[in-house]
Amino acid sequence: MIREMTPEDRNEIDEMQFELQKFFFELDQTRESLSYQSIDDAHYYMQKMIDDTKSMDGKVFVAEKNNVVVGFIQGVIIEHKKGEDKIYDLSHNPSKEGWIGLLYVKPDYRGSGIGQELLGKMKDYFTVQGCTSIKLLVLSDNANAIGFYKKIGFIAHNLEMVMKV
């Protein structure tokens, strides 16, 4: 079952976010240390993310199996209006975009369609809100995630290059 996150889901969401952060650290060669070191740090980060999500007309949905939260997705809406950003105006039309910030499914539940269900729910929300596209960022070394996103219709659009100094 996919539903909107409730305050009762916080501990499970915090634990999943902490696992996700450790995974990112393993893949991201530009990070010298974990962004946060404990579940308390994850809790702080998730509270900020939830507050930001609310202020940006976003949502957090969870996937639940047998009364256990096994995955979540977070997304926000970004509206680009003509004249707000001169550089953006040079290369884009005014638009309303859905942005996926986080998507996580517990390892034991991957490959069972939960990620697709979560994305489908967020896509439905973005569509109702009038978004014309959905965007997300994925680490270039995260082959599984890239394959997943391509399989459901995402295409590679921009490539961000980073150099440590």
Segments (PLM) and residue ranges:
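A short beta-loop-alpha structural element at the N-terminal edge
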Residues: 1-27
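Hydrophobic adenine-recognition pocket in adenosine-nucleotide-binding enzymes
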Residues: 5, 103-105, 138
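Conserved GNAT-fold acetyl-CoA-binding loop/helix
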Residues: 22-48
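A short helix-loop-beta-strand connector motif used in the catalytic cores of GNAT acetyltransferases and
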Residues: 44-62, 99
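Conserved beta-strand in the GNAT
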Residues: 62, 68-76, 99, 104
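Conserved acyl-donor/pantetheine-binding loop and adjacent beta-alpha core of acyl/acetyltransferases
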Residues: 77-98
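Conserved beta-strand-loop-alpha-helix junction that forms the acyl-donor binding cleft
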Residues: 110, 121, 135-145, 162-165
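Conserved active-site alpha-helix within GNAT-family acetyltransferase domains
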Residues: 116, 120, 128, 140-158
